[in-house]
Amino acid sequence: YGLNDAKMQIMQMIGQWITNPGALGTAIAIKGPPGTGKTSLVKEGISKILGREFSFIALGGTGDASFLEGHSYTYEGSMWGRIVQILMESKCMNPVIYFDELDKVSDTPRGEEIIGILTHLTDTSQNSQYHDKYFSEITFDLSKCLFIFSYNDESKVSPILRDRMYRIMTKGYEAKEKLIIAKDFLLPKIREQVAFKDDELIIPDDILTEIIKNDAITMEEEGV
């Protein structure tokens, strides 16, 4: 629901890809406050529109680069990295790979290493020659993957990485929009999860509005 400006930017971007496939790179950045539907926009929007498999990587809790590029197979208990794992799970070479909380990488101990790998992934002149440390002698062609990143604070994103991306902005919701989202999307989802019927879980509009407008509860959040 909502995000019409962001949806328009996505349609323009896809239109450019159709008319001139080489005009844009293979990386997109979505900037916006928490809770504004960035993940849903990618998973339920871009991924389904393009008919591609969707994969999610949370960067906020990533400790070091080995999570992405794996460990050498000579080490006991070593494994391949998350990127190659996604290719195995999706069984294709062109999935949509969504990296959440890019701005949190700068807070991790080895943030620069992670940024280096992400920069390589989004470099169209290099990402057809990706190497995982576990499969050191095998080259993976990631040039057909679509890499999408989300972040809240642009000042914490590497300028080099940021400049490689087609940037899409999402805005927060007004109170009336939050009410519609709560009634038409959130409550039905909650009822389904707990196996309640429509008449077994009823929250009146005035109660929802009070929750939305109560700063002590929502902390003036722009999302839901």
Predicted regions and their residues:
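Pre-Walker A (pre-P-loop) alpha-helix and adjacent loop at the N terminus of AAA/AAA+ ATPase modules
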Residues: 1-31, 83
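AAA+/SF3 P-loop NTPase mechanochemical coupling elements
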Residues: 90-95, 131-150, 203
